[in-house]
Amino acid sequence: MAAGTAAALAFLSQESRTRAGGVGGLRVPAPVTMDSFFFGCELSGHTRSFTFKVEEEDDAEHVLALTMLCLTEGAKDECNVVEVVARNHDHQEIAVPVANLKLSCQPMLSLDDFQLQPPVTFRLKSGSGPVRITGRHQIVTMSNDVSEEESEEEEEDSDEEEVELCPILPAKKQGGRP
């Protein structure tokens, strides 16, 4: 049993040495920055669609999190159907109705941070609106900028932590018990 424990400890020691950098021999993830901005647009009889786009060259991850759709001042008591045009998992464009708003029975709809990947187009399929769409534009960036000084410190830390673990030895039995 002691040999099995020693082998397990040696394996764990080897595993921690093979992982690069960081505290305890573990890889430290790149610093992540997350920014969040208000988003809003209005669809009406004059402006029947709106497209939310981001720059393709941007290395950041963009998410549009929708919070609410609501009829605003001047809306008639008619059905206002709003659809979202986006891409599915196969990168094919699909159109999905997300709201059917009517002033007398359902003037607003909470979407509880319904997340979409840009580009996204909102269309007023029926009705004259105005329909207000609100949410948050979230931008997540990972910084790969590591200074030379930080790299050297990580190498020194990993060298210090490469200490051989001594195997656990079984306790010696005492021969003469009364």
UniProtKB/Swiss-Prot annotation:
InterPro entries: Nucleoplasmin (IPR004301), Nucleoplasmin_core_dom (IPR024057), Nucleoplasmin_core_dom_sf (IPR036824). Residues 141-178 are annotated as: Disordered. The keyword DNA damage does not apply. One of its GO terms (molecular function) is RNA binding. The modification Phosphoserine is found at residues 13, 16, 147, 151, 158. Its main location: nucleus. Residues 146-164 have a biased composition (Acidic residues). The keyword Phosphoprotein applies. It is found in: Nucleus; Nucleus, Nucleolus. Keywords: Acetylation, Chaperone, Methylation, Nucleus, Phosphoprotein. One of its GO terms (biological process) is rRNA transcription. Transmembrane segments: none annotated. The modification N-acetylalanine is found at residue 2. Pfam families: Nucleoplasmin (PF03066). Ubiquitous. One of its GO terms (cellular component) is cytoplasm. Phosphorylated. The modification Omega-N-methylarginine is found at residue 27. SUPFAM superfamilies: Nucleoplasmin-like core domain. Belongs to the nucleoplasmin family. Interacts with NPM (via N-terminus). Forms a pentamer with NPM at a ratio 4:1 (NPM3/NPM). Two pentamers form a decamer. Plays a role in the regulation of diverse cellular processes such as ribosome biogenesis, chromatin remodeling or protein chaperoning. Modulates the histone chaperone function and the RNA-binding activity of nucleolar phosphoprotein B23/NPM. Efficiently mediates chromatin remodeling when included in a pentamer containing NPM3 and NPM. This is Nucleoplasmin-3.
